[in-house]
Amino acid sequence: MPPRKAPAKRRSTDSGVERDRGALSQEKKDQRIALFLSDFDQQAKESIREMKKELDLLLQMAEKAFMVELLKMPTAIRKMKRKDLLNLQEGEEVALAAAATDCALEDVPSPKVTRTNSKKVKVTTIVEYEDAKYTSTKKIPKKVSKSKSLVSLSSGLNSKLHSLSRSVYSSTSVNEAVKTPASDCSATNFKAMPKVSKSAGLQQAVSRTVPTSERVQGMVLRSKSVPQDKMVPFVNIPLADGQTLCMAGGDLRNIDVQLLNQDTVQHIHNLVVSLNQQTCIPTHSSTLSCEINVPGADSSCVFLLRLRNTSD
């Protein structure tokens, strides 16, 4: 029988590659686990932070509610010690609770309606006054509160316009009455009459302060008190009570200037300066009639001045 051959050694199919793959897969697993744990730690920390924030908010709300309840309690209970409060008997606790509720109701301030000053708006309306020979425009400022309605504003403006229209009518009647006594003057007097119309704007402002009946009465008295002699200077000053102060001739030099208002003296000075600066005064003897509105010492008044101009 032939001898058996020894079994040949098998070649190992493991060349070391499988070990490397196993080591790499194990490292990847370790890395994934480490990343998962770190992510878990971060999420846990974030959740803890959110819970702390919510807890802080709850504590703040509790403190605010506690402070509100303390403010509702009377001062005596707030100053009381905890031991004294705990040692109270049942009856005293009931009385204390009732007193606390009463004080809480009494401490609540009753609502009071207060009215504050509203802002004022300055409204400016322009009203035109028409005369036969001259037209003047006057601005009338009026302060109206914001709280007022538009109806009240329009009614106030209508009443103001109505009163102004009456003053214009009365001022034109006064102008006509002033022109009548001077109608018998020379032709140069008619040339000087436009000065009367130029002062209509001032006269309208005066006519608003004096009633219509008093203005008509003063106009009649002025027309009667005019001296017959055209060459004599005169001054008529209507007073606040309806009477008229008449001065003519030498009495004009005896006027006490201290009794007049400072504005009156200034207006008279301006009148004299304007008359001295005129260059179109006729050379022959004539009488110059003019009218000027001057505020007096106690009320508004009208000066009628008749000046004589004589040539050399």
Curated annotation (Swiss-Prot):
Pfam families: Borealin, Nbl1_Borealin_N. The keyword Nucleus applies. Residues 11-26 have a biased composition (Basic and acidic residues). Signal peptide: none annotated. Residues 1-26 are annotated as: Disordered. Gene3D superfamilies: 6.10.140.560, 6.10.250.1900. One of its GO terms (cellular component) is chromosome passenger complex. It is found in: Nucleus; Chromosome, Centromere. Its main location: nucleus. Residues 1-10 have a biased composition (Basic residues). GO terms for biological process: cell division; mitotic sister chromatid segregation. Component of the chromosomal passenger complex (CPC), a complex that acts as a key regulator of mitosis. The CPC complex has essential functions at the centromere in ensuring correct chromosome alignment and segregation and is required for chromatin-induced microtubule stabilization and spindle assembly. Component of the CPC complex. Belongs to the borealin family. PANTHER family: AUSTRALIN, ISOFORM A-RELATED, BOREALIN-2-RELATED. This is Borealin-2. It comes from Gallus gallus (Chicken).
